[in-house]
């Protein structure tokens, strides 16, 4: 049974990728794996693409000991070798290695995942104050143009600065990374931008390294 499952999974992960996939979402979680008699932490990466028709599909999965640039580069090149092309925007958490690999392999821009960013932002706010802060942050993503979104971001950061200095500091440092998508076609709206990440982590909670075990 296990051999049959392995064969089907390997065939799925090695299948050719056809057509253009402009948007590529990448998410990572951590699991414990038994290797050579020891329990070690490994990164499990999943890549979800969206094609020009708006169809979503899991394009690849990989595991690795770290999330350094060589790992990301090897993973993205494996997708390219299977035929992945036309990638314009890679959406993921704030991984410097992934940012460099996306540029190297696909010449694509990197969009910081808004779901992860929002959780990081709210971790700097007391729970009872979060609804008001969320309402302010949402006004940024409701803007119709990149210029308006950047202006609203700065205004919201200044509004929050006195009460939430750590949140304002995060906003100052991450504005360009979170608003990259505003330079792309409006069809990639905020709701669609967040769909794969919400599906992967549906609960409204602070980010954490999820536990579990992979077989040896």
PLM segments and residue spans:
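A detector of single, family-specific signature residues
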Residues: 9, 16, 52, 58, ...
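Amphipathic alpha-helical transducer elements in NTP-driven molecular machines
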Residues: 23, 41, 69-73, 92-99, ...
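Short helix/loop capping segments that flank catalytic or ligand/cofactor-binding pockets
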Residues: 33-34, 99-100, 179-180, 200
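Acidic/histidine-rich catalytic cores and adjacent linkers
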Residues: 142-216
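RNase H-like nuclease fold core
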Residues: 2-91, 96, 104-108
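Conserved phosphate-chemistry cores used by DNA topoisomerases
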Residues: 19-22, 73-77, 100, 128, ...
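Conserved beta-strand -> loop -> alpha-helix junction used to position metal-binding or nucleic-acid-contacting
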Residues: 28, 89-96, 101-138
């Amino acid at each position: 049974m296990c051999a049959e499952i392995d064969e089907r999974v390997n065939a799925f992960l090695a299948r050719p990728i056809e057509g253009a996939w402009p948007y590529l979402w990448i998410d990572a979680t951590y699991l414990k794996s038994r290797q050579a008699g020891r329990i070690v932490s490994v990164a499990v990466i999943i890549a979800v693409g969206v094609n020009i028709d708006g169809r979503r599909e899991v394009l690849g999965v990989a595991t690795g000991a770290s999330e350094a640039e060589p790992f990301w580069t090897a993973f993205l090149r494996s997708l390219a070798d299977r035929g992945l092309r036309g990638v314009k925007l890679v959406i993921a958490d704030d991984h410097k290695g992934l940012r460099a690999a996306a540029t190297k392999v696909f010449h694509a821009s990197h969009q910081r995942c808004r779901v992860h960013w929002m959780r990081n932002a709210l971790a700097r706010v007391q729970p009872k104050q979060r609804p008001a802060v969320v309402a302010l942050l949402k006004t940024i993503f409701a803007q119709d143009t990149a210029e308006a979104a950047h202006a609203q971001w700065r205004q919201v950061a200044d509004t929050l600065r006195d009460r939430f200095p750590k949140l304002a500091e995060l906003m100052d440092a991450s504005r360009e990374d979170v608003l990259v998508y505003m330079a792309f076609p409006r069809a990639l709206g905020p709701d669609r931008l967040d769909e794969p990440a919400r599906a992967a982590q549906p609960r409204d909670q602070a980010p954490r390294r999820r536990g579990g075990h992979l077989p040896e």
